[in-house]
Amino acid sequence: MNVYDKVLQFGSKKARARGMALNKLSRNRLEDIYAGSGPLVFGFGPIDMVDPGSLNPSIKTLDTVYVAAVQPDNQYVVHHFVPGRNEWVETDASTHQPTALVGVLVQDHKAKTREVEDLKSQLSQLRMEHEILRHEYERLKLKSPIVKPFKPLKVLLFSLLLGLLFAGVTNGARTGTCYAYDEEKDTCLYWEWKDSREVAWYDSYVTEALAIYNRACVYVRSKEFMTYLSLVFQTVFNWYFCATALAVYYMARAENPIVMFVTLALATLSQFQLLAVAVLPLLDFSATMGLWLSMVVFYMSQQISILVSFCVLVLSVMIGTFMADSEYAMMIKGHAVVFAIVCYSHVAMILNIPPWVVSLTMVCYRLWRVCFVFPAERLEIRSADGKVLHTVPTHPNWTAKVTRFVQSLRKGLRTSVAPTARIVPDGIAIVEAREGVGTCFRVKNNLVTSKHVVGSDDAVKIRWGAQEDMARVTYRHPTKDIALMALPTNLQTMPAYKFAKAITDGPIVMTAFDEANLLLVAVTEGVRVEDHMTYSVATRNGMSGAPITTVDGRVIAVHQTNTGFTGGAVIFVPEDIPEVRKISKREQELEDRVKQLEGMLNMDQAYVDSNLIVDLVREAVQREMKVLRTELANLGGFSQKKKGKNKSTKRKRKAVWTEEEYKAMLEKGFTRDQLRIMADAIRDQYYDDEDEQSEEEAGYPDWSDPGDSTDIENEWFGYEQSWKELEPAKSGVVVNTLPKDLVFKYSLDNYPISKQDIQAVAKELKIYEKAISDIISTSVSTDGKWKDDVDAQKILQELDGLWWGINHTLWEHGLMPFTQRRKRVQQPKKLQRGPEDPGPEECKLDYWEQLVEPSKEKFLVPPEYPLLGVVPLDRPISDFDAPVDNLLALLPEPESPDLGFEPAVWGPEAYVKSFEKFDFADPDPNIEKNYPREWAFANLVLHREFDFLADSVVKDITATSKNSESTPGFPKTYWWKTEAEYLAKRGYADYVSEWNRIRGGARPNVLWYLFLKKEILKSTKVRDADIRQIICSDPIFARIGCCFEEDQNERMKRRTKTRMPQCGWSPFFGGFNDRIQRLVAKGNPYWIEFDWTRYDGTIPSQIFKHIKNFRFSMLAKEYQTPELRNMYHWYVDNILRRYVCMPSGEITIQHKGNPSGQVSTTMDNNLVNVFLQAFEYAYLHPEKSMDELRKDWESYDSLIYGDDRLTTSPSVPNDYVTRVVAMYKDIFGMWVKPEKVKVSHSPVGLSFCGFVITHQDGQYLPVPAEEAKLLASLLRPTKKLENMDALYGKLLCYRILNHNLPNDNKFRNYILVALEVMARHYSSRGEEPPFYVTESMLDKLWRGGPKFDYG
């Protein structure tokens, strides 16, 4: 099995050989069961089987093979082979000491090996990061300014060079007349100086310049033009000016300009001039020295200079033979260039070639070389295997060291933009321990921080804002630097982080406190290395334990290291939080004893040679294991039964409640039968057989080798299971089965049928299938319910009879009945997929048009709507799932099971009916023109109510916020389930490209996906298939809308206290009372509760378009450009004229209403609501002027949320209800039911947002308006709850909602009793409820601060 098992081979050799032989026959293999485990131990032991040779069924004990080992999780596991089933089955048996101890050591060795590999990987990663950071530090390090010291030699050389250059330029000479001349001595005997000096260069240049100017004006096309042009070149390429500029430049910028000064001086004296400077990049050090020597000799004798340069060239050829090829080639090339320019200068002197011609020649040569020849700047010296040994430059410009200052001009370029991220600023707290300070955050009901922060403390101090409390350390992770603390009661309102679905490389966010309690946020790139996350952040003390989150705010790791600049974190996943289980006193004592034993073992192992491990196992722990076995045998729960004690005993009925509790529950209204049912449910769920048996449980024997292997073989291979026991038995009890599950229960589609089955009973199988199909089709409707005239019990009895008959037929033919066969697991249907790698074309908004195919048959599209075609989409259409939550059995039964509400279920007809919300009445075709007074007043109120939207901004599409866990729409649903997956794969590239494409003039048609909403509805609506439809657009289209409207939406959410719209409000902490008091302060005599029916579906298009135009007009002027205006009009047009895709793939068009899936549905409904209220007030008061309407509106106020409205008005007509219902129908085509309009003189009794207003103790407090709907969502939910904690939390939410109800309210009392019952359930499990709230806490939650004595 593994190297340890091959060497040690614990147990019986016979059992090992037999076990290996049986392993080949087994359906599951030991290689899979004990993969990665330590050494195995084989042995023989008994197993109880049915005796096949007895007429009456009896139990016979056989010998079988037992195998045991320690698995990777350090669990000692035992399996034995079960004949007949041919399978290794896990069981219990006594522990084989050597196997257990060696196995633990093996697993510990593997864990240490993995840890070492992890540390090596981390070390390698840290070394790489250190090198990168060191390089970055050197690049970014601010260099101190260099103060060049004063060098007299440099200044002296520069002065001499300038004097030499100006001396040559000025050509100054004094003139005079010689009156006596000695021809023999060639000397003037008498010379008379003139009084003035002539400046040769000044006069000649001025004269030549004037001559050139005059001749150019007169003779621009003459032959003499080229002559004057040559004079211009002579001026431009003058050596003295070039040399002077070069000297000044090197004097100002170069660190050591002496080399250049010497070259310029020698070039001036020797008349080499520009030649000497031009060839410097081609010369190495020896060639440069040769050039200087040649120029010095050239000044004295040109012929000797040629000879000297040639000798130096020959000498370098001979001496350089010992050098490397690359260096030798560069040196020879440099000296050859020196010899060439010496010869060239001599020829230029003889032919009297002007210096400017030489300069022009050199400039042309360099220009030609730059433009047409690209010589290599470096040579790579490689070995025979291609490895680069070193690199040498082809132009050894050793003087380039003087121009190193150019490198300071290099700047780093920004190559990326940090993404925007979501943080939870109040989601972290400060943890203070004896060993230091850190940061912690909440996950579920735990506070999480680094293990090194809490150290060895059992309790630490937590500071969250102004609140301080002590938290108990409950868990320290064994391998990760993570510690968990219990959440204190005072911190229950602290926001909790959620886990990320995937942890990948990319942008991460760190939110932490430093040691000065300052909130710090960092966004950077993170790289995952196995169980760690590495990143570069300037971390500080106190940041340990901070959450590392994605840009969506989901936690992925816990910050743990602080090196001053680099940061590291340990990955944090849900599996790192242990399951909480209360440890009994007996288990704690046993655990302490085992730890004591392990400590003794570790002490002994420090002195043992690794080669003597077997002796260590046998000798070192033999005494301690005997003591431990004796103690375990003396414990009642762990003691073994004596051999033969196999009779089971009847369990004792355990009392659930005390007598006082039982009487108290009777007084609360429970009947005795209800309490008996609840007690049985508690016993069935939490009954522990081990604790209730009156006799000792049977154990398994120690390992032993049987004496005769022949007996074992006879027992094994002569065994057959008794066929009589497999005979199907006909049950007299009919199990109540839901009609929608009949096919799954009685059909044979999910059972394996062999060839032998078909040969034996093919006719019977065919008859059975036909009978089952006929019964189900005639008894069950298409929506999965019993038909009205069907007796369900009779049908189920008939089906059970057929099921028993077909199974008994198989048994009679010697075939395995279906009741003994394993049903095939129904795999979920795979959705149709698109191309494997969608490109930018598939992600465009109008790509769906390429997938449309023609179709004429309507299925889900209503008759009056067009069918444009179908796309390849096959999604579930019907939903008859009404979940049955087993956890609800823990709750008491309500007084009335018929609540009038139930979960929405639907068939195909519900889709057709959902379109009726668009068709109530036709609005006036031109409301603005036919009602100008009302329209003008409504528009005036609209601007006044939403004046704070002025100068709103257009956001970048990558900075918008939207629920990314929503559907990506069609056709992106082919490749991604949510927009988050789409963004993770493609990023924002498609968003930006589509934005630019539409801004550039493209106008694609957007497809909306339609589905029905699963929610609690009135039973009458469910029966009438009146289900709400939701439509969602492509996420790119939705985020384009967010660009224009997200800033305005956020502004409206921040002004719920002073304005009408209440999207974003909170009724807690006095919020409900504050808003009602705001309306009461107006002092109006009239209060109106108003509600539309099918509000958003009947909004007239002209009203909706006017609201959208108003929103665009409130943007800042810089955003109201023609291209953005046209783009916004395209966005609005795609909302009003929508291409809708049904789950069947059908495509139709909707022309009315505000779709309930766009990003601003509620905000737009609020704007429309305000506009309609103002129009309504002006319409119902035709006698008032515009000034009077404005004055009345000062005392008019409302609270609105979509179509919900609570209004206080200074005046209401007598026939208000009749007139307002008619107005909305005739003018706007909207549906207002008279019973949905209530007029009152007090707000008490009216409702808003599902709350009825009450007045208690001087405050307006809310109570639930539909208690039956809330109770139905508890007892008949739309989906199952995860566990008891979720059920308790849901009950607690209802407890908060009904806090303000009267004490005799039935719904309130039911929730209180249910919470008490759940507390009993927790108590019976030895646990405490996860939450607890008091009356004073709820009073403060609803009423607010201490001014009402509730703070």
Curated annotation (Swiss-Prot):
Site (Cleavage): G172, A173, Q407, S408, Q640, K641, Q721, S722, Q826, Q827
Entry EC no(s): 3.4.21.-, 2.7.7.48
GO MF terms held by the record: ATP binding; RNA binding; RNA-directed RNA polymerase activity; serine-type peptidase activity
Annotated Pfam families: Astro_1A, RdRP_1, Trypsin_2
Segments of this protein annotated with the region Disordered: 687-708, 822-842
Reaction catalysed by this enzyme: RNA(n) + a ribonucleoside 5'-triphosphate = RNA(n+1) + diphosphate
Transmembrane segments: 153-173, 231-251, 257-277, 304-324, 337-357
Domain (RdRp catalytic) ranges: 1085-1217
Keyword Transmembrane: yes
Family: Belongs to the astroviridae polyprotein 1AB family.
UniProt-recorded name of the protein: Non-structural polyprotein 1AB
Organism: Ovine astrovirus 1 (OAstV-1)
Lineage: Viruses, Riboviria, Orthornavirae, Pisuviricota, Stelpaviricetes
